[in-house]
Amino acid sequence: MIIDRVEVETINSFSKSELLKEIYGLIWILPILALLLGITIEVLVIVWLEREISASIQQRIGPEYAGPLGLLQAIADGTKLLLKEDILPSRGEIPLFSIGPSIAVISVLLSFLVIPLGYRFVLADLSIGVFLWIAISSIAPIGLLMAGYSSNNKYSFSGGLRAAAQSISYEIPLTFCVLAISLLSNSSSTVDIVEAQSKYGFFGWNLWRQPIGFLVFLISSLAECERLPFDLPEAEEELVAGYQTEYSGIKYGLFYLVSYLNLLVSSLFVTVLYLGGWNFSIPYISFFGFFQMNKIIGILEMVIGIFITLTKAYLFLFISITIRWTLPRMRMDQLLNLGWKFLLPISLGNLLLTTSSQLVSL
C-alpha cells in the first residue's frame, strides 16, 4: 500500500497541533500550581507565626520539637489529622456533612484569583474584581451552615446559625467600604486600585483618604475571619467547637485550613485596598526606572513586589494575632449590635461622604 506524502504531512501536523495544545494546557496550569504552592507555604508560615507570637505574649515557650524552631509543627499536625479516622454522625445528613467543608475551602481559594500579589502577577485582572471577591466570600457561610445543620447536634447547629448571622451582619459594612474605595479609584479592578495609589507613594495610600473606612474594614475583616473577639460560632466554653463539633480527621483539618486562609485573604485585601499593594513607599521614585526593562528586571520587579505585598499583609496578621490575646470574647447580642447599629451607619455615612466629594470634584 502506497501512502500519499500529503497524508503523512497532514498526520504529522495534526499530531504536532495536539502536542502544542497539551503543552499550552500545562503552561496555563503552571501559574495556578505556583499560587497553590505559595498559599500552602504561607499558611504554614502563618500557623508558625501565630504560635510563636502567642507564646511570646503569654510568656511561654512555643513549638520547638518538630523541625528547627518548630517550623514543621503545622505539617506534623496536618499529617496527624490525615491519619485520623473520618467519623460520620449516625443520624446526620451525610451528603451535606461531607460537602460543607469543601464549599468553605473552595470559596476561600477562589478569592485568590483577583488578588494582585505583585506587579503583573494576578491570575485574573477583572473589571469587577473586588465585587467578585465579596460575592465569592459570601458562599463560605453556606458551607458552615450546612455543616452545622447536617451534624444533627444542637451545638453544631447553633454554631452554624451564629456563623451565618455574623457573616450577614459584617458583610454589608465591608461592602460599603469596598464601594468607597472603588469610587475613589474610579475602578473595581484590584490592579487599578493598587495603581491608583502609586503616584504619591506612602502618602497616596487609601489609608489616609479613607481612615474611617479602613477601621470599619479592619473590624469587619476580623469578624468575617471569626477571630477573637468575634469567634462566637465556635466558642469553646459555650458550643464545644460550634459547627466543627462532630467533625474529625481531614474534614476537621479543612475547617482549620479555612480559618487561616480567610485570615490570609483578608490581610492581602487590606494591603491591596488601603496600603498600596506592591508599590514602594517613596513617592515619584521607582527603583527599576534606572534600568533598561528586560525579562530579568521584570521578574525581579515582580518578586520584590510580592515581597512588599506580603510584608504589608503580615502587619495585619500581627495585629489580628495580638488582638486575639488582648480582647475578651463578645456576647452574641453585642456582636450583632456592633455590626448593625454601629459599623453599618458609619460605613454608609462614609460612602455618602465619598460619593459627595467625588461629585464635587467633577
Swiss-Prot record:
InterPro entries: NADH_UbQ_OxRdtase_su1/FPO, NADH_UbQ_OxRdtase_su1_CS. Its main location: plastid. It is a multi-pass membrane protein. GO terms for molecular function: oxidoreductase activity, acting on NAD(P)H, quinone or similar compound as acceptor; quinone binding. It comes from the Eukaryota. Its EC number is 7.1.1.-. It is found in: Plastid, Chloroplast thylakoid membrane. GO terms for biological process: aerobic respiration; photosynthesis, light reaction. Pfam families: NADHdh (PF00146). GO terms for cellular component: chloroplast thylakoid membrane. It is an enzyme of class 7 (translocase). The chain crosses the membrane at residues 27-47, 94-114, 128-148, 164-184, 202-222, 247-267, 303-323, 335-355. Keywords: Chloroplast, Membrane, NAD, NADP, Plastid, Plastoquinone, Quinone, Thylakoid, Translocase, Transmembrane, Transmembrane helix. It catalyses: a plastoquinone + NADH + (n+1) H(+)(in) = a plastoquinol + NAD(+) + n H(+)(out); a plastoquinone + NADPH + (n+1) H(+)(in) = a plastoquinol + NADP(+) + n H(+)(out). NDH is composed of at least 16 different subunits, 5 of which are encoded in the nucleus. NDH shuttles electrons from NAD(P)H:plastoquinone, via FMN and iron-sulfur (Fe-S) centers, to quinones in the photosynthetic chain and possibly in a chloroplast respiratory chain. The immediate electron acceptor for the enzyme in this species is believed to be plastoquinone. Couples the redox reaction to proton translocation, and thus conserves the redox energy in a proton gradient. Belongs to the complex I subunit 1 family. PANTHER family: NADH DEHYDROGENASE SUBUNIT 1, NADH-UBIQUINONE OXIDOREDUCTASE CHAIN 1. NCBIfam families: PRK06076.1-2 (NF004741). This is NAD(P)H-quinone oxidoreductase subunit 1, chloroplastic.
